[in-house]
């Protein structure tokens, strides 16, 4: 579980996040939704430690991120998997080398152990027989699957996905959504997904938080989002 308490962030005097409070639950897909420029990407970057908030707390389990020492932060990073918007695969590395990459930094496993774990992760995302291929030889959907395999390589407790459907056709988007949801439940991860895709929200949104102009205006689930008591959210739903 991750708790966010009264989080605020500004850039050049402009407040981008305003007193955000939200809880992200374990074993569920927790969605951060909102229009472009609403602040959802800034919130995601604060959650994973790429930015520091001006005020407020981010609590992983029972430990505040701001109060962790460097050793504790390193331990936390080992428990975080990230699926970047563009998959962020290394073009110079093969599929299996991409998946093994985080293991080289955070484990003392032998090359054989790393390869075995990478193959297991690739099987989990239904990528078989592509170990020696390079990312540019694969479709966007396959690249996304490999990105997910790399994100779960260290068996993380927390999974963050930034616009996982970006650049995908509707059918492939559904498959990727279901894969993220299935892995979340199988490994009991706390998964946080940043998206503006309504199909994705309705497909896997166990918990949903709507951000508008830096404020968390509404929280609910996929059962209640189509009849919200929030005018700004109604506009967002109609536009998407």
Task: List the model feature ranges, each with a label.
Residues 56-64:
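Conserved ABC transporter NBD signature motif
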Residues 134-138, 142:
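Conserved ABC ATPase signature
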Residues 48:
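Helix-to-loop junction immediately C-terminal to a conserved catalytic motif
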């Amino acid at each position: 579980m991750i708790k966010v308490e009264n989080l605020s962030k500004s850039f050049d005097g402009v407040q981008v996040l305003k007193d955000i409070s939200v809880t992200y639950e374990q074993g569920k897909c927790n969605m951060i939704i909102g229009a472009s420029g609403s602040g959802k990407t800034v919130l995601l970057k604060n959650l994973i430690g790429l930015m520091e908030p001006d005020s407020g707390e981010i609590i992983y389990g029972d430990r505040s991120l701001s109060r962790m020492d460097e050793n504790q932060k390193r331990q936390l990073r080992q428990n975080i998997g990230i699926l970047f918007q563009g998959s962020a695969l290394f073009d110079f590395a093969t599929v299996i080398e991409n998946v093994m990459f985080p293991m080289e930094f955070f484990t003392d496993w032998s090359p054989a152990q790393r390869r075995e774990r990478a193959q297991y992760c690739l099987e989990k995302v239904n990528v078989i027989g592509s170990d020696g291929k390079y990312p540019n030889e694969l479709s966007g959907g396959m690249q996304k699957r490999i990105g997910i395999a790399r994100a779960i390589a260290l068996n993380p407790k927390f999974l963050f996905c930034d616009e996982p459907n970006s650049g995908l056709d509707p059918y492939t988007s559904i498959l990727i959504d279901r894969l993220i949801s299935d892995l979340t439940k199988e490994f009991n991860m706390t998964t946080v997904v940043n998206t503006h895709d309504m199909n994705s929200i309705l497909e896997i949104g166990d918990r949903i938080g709507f951000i508008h102009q830096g404020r968390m205006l509404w929280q609910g689930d996929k059962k209640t989002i189509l009849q919200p008591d929030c005018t700004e959210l109604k506009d967002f739903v109609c536009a998407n």
